[in-house]
Each structure stands twice: as structure tokens, then as C-alpha cells.
UniProtKB/Swiss-Prot annotation:
Mg(2+) binds at residues 173, 193. Residues 160-328 form the OBG-type G domain. Residues 1-159 form the Obg domain. It is found in: Cytoplasm. ATP binds at residues 166-173, 191-195, 213-216, 280-283, 309-311. One of its GO terms (molecular function) is GTP binding. This is GTPase Obg. Its cofactor is Mg(2+). CDD domains: Obg. One of its GO terms (biological process) is ribosome biogenesis.
Length: 329
């Protein structure tokens, strides 16, 4: 499945139906009064969160969504039928912005949560509204009004409690695959992960906690370099970050600083987010280098790193104990 996490669409509420001019034409009522009915209300356009959807892919192929127009009024003061709401399904975690102003209109995070993004136009008035002492047979009615029309920006931000971050090839996909039932593509080269991967990790209570493996960041990610710029938004909702550092890298300290710099540059409070520092690929670290690497990372980050090997399933229980403790579980 192709992962699309941004989309631009246009929404337009239905036009209100027109009011009509009509007069009573009944037996024994030779000069009936005005009886023109009002037009129906145009359809609203509504976004609805659906937990069964994982991507905004559908909006790649259809970008204009218009509600049904209201029906015109009828004789005998009959109001025209209103257009039923046009309901558009989006994934849970979709943030909706007005494209022109950037104003956030809503944030759909729970299943079946709804947001009206364009109201339909009001129906026009029939001539029955214009009866007066001076005008007993009004010929006046009004047209229905146009519905609202707006350009919108949809942004999907994954709903995960724990985000796994780090440079490309730090072992994030291997870690999430070992911890959960997720099966991301894994290989020994940078940028294997091109989309965020979600995995559910069982808590001690038996409930599940969603972990997100965020595609690798590189220097300049917050300004658009590499893959990180498009996916940093997915860790905005997380409660906790696992910062994974490749223990077998040429310079683990430099790798640490690159990611921390990108979190700070991106903003949105990410640099203050609770974080666990984890050195992965413990098996690749020479025994004589281990203390120096741990000491350097501790001094630079102010955090004592945990040592794990995702590939060999070492140290992961201790890491999860820290995760549950940080989350208050």
C-alpha cells in the first residue's frame, strides 16, 4: 500500500434550493392566497475519522468534493428536500487546515469523530413569506444561497504513544519487528524504511501500546533534507521517544548530535519530549570501546544510555521496563 500522509482537497457545500411562486388552486377557493414553498437546505460536507483507514491515498485521485443541492420548493407551502450530508472518511489522526490561512479547523483523532468543513447554502423563500396587507398576491420569491467552498490541507499524524527515532540504518525497523508483530522491510542500507511503520507492543497489563518507527533522519531533515521532513510530524503526538543510536557506527556521538539538532530545529516541543537513549547493535562494539562510547553519549545528552541488540534480542526487556515506567504503566 502506498503511504500518503498529506493531501489538498476542495470542499463545497450544496446550493440551497430555490423558493417558488405558487397560489392555492382548490375547489371552492377561487382566489387562493400565496402557497409557494421554500427551497431545501444544501448538503453539508463532513469529514469523519475511520480507524480502518491508514493513509490519505484516496485523495490522490479525487480532490473536489461537492454536496448535493437542495430541491426547489413546492406548492401548498411544501419545503424542498434538503441534501443529505456528504460524509468523507479520513484516517484517525488527520489534522485539517484551511489552505489559504493555515488555521487549524479540527483534529480528528477518535473513530467516527466528525467535523463539518463546508456548510450547505440556505434554501430560498417561497412567495408565501411575502403575503402582507398591502400585497395579497405576492409574486416574489428568492433563490437558494450558494454553499461554502474552501480549499483544505489534510495532514495525517500517526497516533502512536512511543516514537522510535534515529539516523538511517540505526536498527529501528529491526527493533519494532522484534517488539511487535509488525513486519517492516529490513536491509543493511540507509533509507530502507520509506514510510512510518506501526507496531503494537503488549504491556504488562495485556493492553497494547502503539510504537512508530519513523523513517531515518539526516542532517537538515527539519529543512527538508532526506526523508525526515515529511515524517517528523508523526512524532508530534507521541508521549515518549526512543532515540536509537547505532553502536557500530563510525562516530555514535556525532550521530546523537545530528538527531538532537534536528529535533530542536523542527520545534513543536520535540526536544523537550521525554526520551530514552538506547545504543543498538551492542554486539558490534569492541569491548575496549564500550565504556568510552557510553561515557561520551551520557555526557553529551545528560541521559545514561541502555545497551541492546535488537537483532540478537538482548536487553529489550530492560528497555521495555523503562518505557512502561516513563509512561506510568
Amino acid at each position: 500500500m502506498q503511504f500518503i500522509d498529506q493531501a489538498r482537497i476542495s470542499v463545497r457545500g450544496g446550493r440551497g434550493g430555490d423558493g417558488i411562486v405558487a397560489f392555492r388552486r382548490e375547489k371552492y377557493v377561487p382566489a387562493g392566497g400565496p402557497s409557494g414553498g421554500d427551497g431545501g437546505q444544501g448538503a453539508d460536507v463532513v469529514l469523519e475519522a475511520d480507524s480502518n483507514l491508514q493513509t490519505l491515498l484516496d485523495f490522490k485521485y479525487k480532490r473536489l468534493f461537492a454536496g448535493i443541492d437542495g430541491r426547489r420548493g413546492g406548492p401548498n407551502r411544501c419545503t424542498g428536500a434538503s441534501g443529505p450530508p456528504l460524509v468523507i472518511k479520513v484516517p484517525c489522526g488527520t489534522e485539517v487546515r484551511h489552505l489559504s490561512t493555515g488555521i487549524v479547523l479540527g483534529d480528528l483523532t477518535t473513530h467516527e469523530e466528525r467535523l463539518t468543513v463546508a456548510f450547505g447554502g440556505r434554501g430560498g423563500l417561497g412567495n408565501a413569506h411575502y403575503l402582507s396587507n398591502r400585497n395579497r398576491a405576492p409574486e416574489k420569491c428568492t433563490e437558494g444561497r450558494d454553499g461554502e467552498e474552501w480549499p483544505l490541507q489534510l495532514e495525517l499524524k500517526l497516533l502512536a504513544e512511543v516514537g522510535i527515532i534515529g539516523l538511517p540504518n540505526a536498527g529501528k525497523s529491526t527493533l519494532i519487528s522484534v517488539l511487535s508483530a509488525a513486519r517492516p522491510k529490513i536491509a543493511d542500507y540507509p533509507f530502507t524504511t520509506l514510510i512510518p511503520n506501526l507496531g503494537v507492543v503488549r504491556r504488562p497489563t495485556g493492553d497494547g501500546t502503539v510504537f512508530a518507527d519513523i523513517p531515518g533522519l539526516i542532517a537538515g531533515a527539519a529543512q527538508g533534507a532526506g526523508l525526515g521532513h515529511d515524517f517528523l510530524r508523526h512524532i508530534e503526538r507521541t508521549r515518549l521517544l526512543i532515540h536509537l543510536v547505532d553502536g557500530g557506527a563510525e562516530d555514535p556521538l556525532l550521530d546523537l548530535r545530528v538527531v538532537e539538532k534536528e529535533l530542536e530545529a523542527y520545534g513543536h516541543g520535540l526536544v523537550e519530549r521525554p526520551r530514552i537513549l538506547v545504543i543498538n547493535k551492542q554486539e558490534l562494539i569492541q569491548e575496549e570501546d564500550l565504556d568510552a562510547i557510553v561515557s561520551a553519549l551520557t555526557e553529551a545528552s545528560g541521559r545514561t544510555p541502555l545497551l541492546v541488540s535488537a537483532a540478537m534480542n538482548r536487553g529489550l526487556d530492560d528497555m521495555l521496563d523503562r518505557v512502561w515506567s516513563e509512561l506510568g504503566i
